[in-house]
Design a protein with these regions (language model features):
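N-terminal binding-site loop/beta-alpha segment at the start of enzyme catalytic domains
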Residues: 1-76
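Acidic (Asp/Glu)-rich catalytic clusters
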Residues: 10-15, 44, 66-77, 108-112, ...
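N-terminal small/glycine-rich loop or linker at the start of catalytic domains
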Residues: 10-26, 79-92, 115, 120
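Active-site mouth loops of central-metabolism enzymes
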Residues: 22-33, 86-101, 122-128
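Acidic-and-aromatic substrate-binding clefts and catalytic sites of carbohydrate-active enzymes
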Residues: 27-31, 53-62, 125-129, 156-157, ...
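Short, acidic/polar
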Residues: 30-42, 95-111, 159-164
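Active-site groove signature of glycoside hydrolases
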Residues: 108-129
Length: 331
C-alpha cells in the first residue's frame, strides 16, 4: 500500500486512505461480479475511501455498492455526490433545496444506508443561489444524512463563497475538494492549490481525480485510431472524455511523457500516478479501474514512492509547454 499518510476529515471516524477507489465504471463497463472483486482487492490493500455519485451509470453504481458494502460499511469512508441533473430531482435544479434533498435521499436509498460519510456538491449550479444550497446543506447535515461536506469541480472563489455562507447559515464548511488534476490537466495549480494552502481555506483537503486522464496516460490510445473498448470508446461518458482529452496537443504531450517514463524505467501510468500522489498539494488520489490488473498496477505504483527530482523536472517541462507563454493575471 502507498506510504503517504491517511487523511483525517472532521466528523468521519475512519481515516481516508491516500488512494480512494473510484467506482464510476461499476454498472457501466464493469459488471457486478467484477465490481465485487475490485472492491475486495481495494479494501484488502488498505484503501478506505469508496467514491461514487448519483449520476454514475444512471444510478446503477450506487445500487451495486448498496449490495456489496453493508457488511463492510464501518471500514470505509463512503462518498457520493449530487449536483448534476438526475431524475430523482423531479425537474428541480440540482443544488436547489428540493433538488439537493431529493438527490441525497435517492442516493441513500440505492446505497442502502441512512447516511454517507462524505457528501459532495458535484459541480456548480448556475441557477440556484448559493445561499439556498447551503441552507439545504445545513438542514441535511442537522438530520444526520451526511457527516462531512465536500465540493467537486468548483473554482477557488466559489469555495470561498460557500465557506462564507456556511459560517453565516450554521452549515458545515466544505472540508475537501475533488478536482481534476493530472500531468495533462494542471490548471488547478494556477490558483486553487494556493488557495487550499492558505489559512483562509480552513484546512481544505484536496483529492485529485482523473489521475490517468481517463486512460490517455496509460499510453494505450493513439492519435488517429479508434479508441475501442473503455472510457473513450464504450462507456456512457465516452463523448465527454473525448471532448476533454482527444486533442493533438495532449497526444503530443503523452508521447513526450512516455519518453520520460521510458528513460526512468517505469510504466507511463506509474509515472503519472506517482507524480500526482506525492505532490505536497495532494491529499488523496481517486483511482478508477476496469479490471483487477489495472487496480493491481495502480497499487504497485503507489507503493513505489516519489519520483526522482530529474524525472519531476522533465514532467514539469512538458507541463510548461502545455500551458504556453500566456502570463498569469494575478501576482
Amino acid at each position: 500500500m502507498v506510504t503517504a499518510p491517511a487523511v483525517a476529515l472532521p466528523n468521519i471516524p475512519v481515516a481516508l486512505s491516500p488512494l480512494v477507489l473510484g467506482t464510476m465504471t461499476f454498472g457501466d463497463t464493469v459488471d457486478r461480479a467484477e465490481a465485487a472483486r475490485l472492491l475486495d482487492m481495494a479494501l484488502d490493500a488498505g484503501i478506505t475511501g469508496v467514491d461514487t455519485a448519483n449520476v454514475y451509470a444512471g444510478g446503477a453504481t450506487e445500487s451495486i455498492l448498496g449490495e456489496l458494502l453493508p457488511k463492510r460499511r464501518d471500514r470505509v469512508v463512503l462518498a457520493t455526490k449530487a449536483g448534476i441533473a438526475h431524475p430523482d430531482q423531479g425537474g428541480h435544479a440540482p443544488l436547489s433545496r428540493a433538488g439537493l434533498r431529493a438527490a441525497l435521499e435517492g442516493s441513500l436509498r440505492r446505497l442502502g444506508t441512512d447516511h454517507v460519510d462524505l457528501f459532495y456538491l458535484h459541480q456548480p449550479d448556475h441557477v440556484t443561489p448559493p445561499a439556498e444550497t447551503m441552507a439545504a446543506v445545513a438542514e441535511l447535515a442537522a438530520e444526520g444524512r451526511f457527516l462531512a461536506l465536500g465540493v467537486s469541480n468548483h473554482a477557488a472563489w466559489r469555495i470561498a463563497d460557500l465557506m462564507r455562507l456556511a459560517d453565516e447559515l450554521a452549515a458545515p464548511r466544505p472540508v475537501i475538494a475533488q478536482q481534476l488534476h493530472n500531468l495533462l490537466a494542471r490548471r488547478i495549480e494556477e490558483e486553487f492549490t494556493g488557495f487550499a494552502a492558505h489559512p483562509a481555506a480552513h484546512g481544505l483537503r484536496t483529492m485529485a481525480y482523473n489521475a490517468l486522464a481517463g486512460g490517455l496516460l496509460t499510453g494505450r490510445y493513439q492519435e488517429g485510431r479508434a479508441p475501442g473498448a473503455g472510457r473513450f470508446g464504450t462507456s456512457r461518458l465516452a463523448s465527454a472524455y473525448q471532448d476533454r482529452y482527444w486533442h493533438d496537443g495532449l497526444f503530443a504531450a503523452v508521447a513526450r511523457l512516455r519518453d520520460v517514463a521510458d528513460g526512468a524505467g517505469i510504466p507511463l501510468a506509474a509515472l503519472a500516478l506517482r507524480w500526482l500522489l506525492h505532490r505536497e498539494s495532494t491529499d488523496a488520489v481517486l483511482i478508477g479501474c476496469s479490471g483487477a490488473g489495472q487496480l493491481r498496477a495502480n497499487l504497485e505504483a503507489a507503493a513505489a514512492g516519489p519520483l526522482p527530482d530529474d524525472v519531476l523536472g522533465a514532467c514539469d517541462e512538458v507541463g510548461a509547454d502545455l500551458r504556453g507563454p500566456m502570463p498569469a493575471y494575478h501576482r
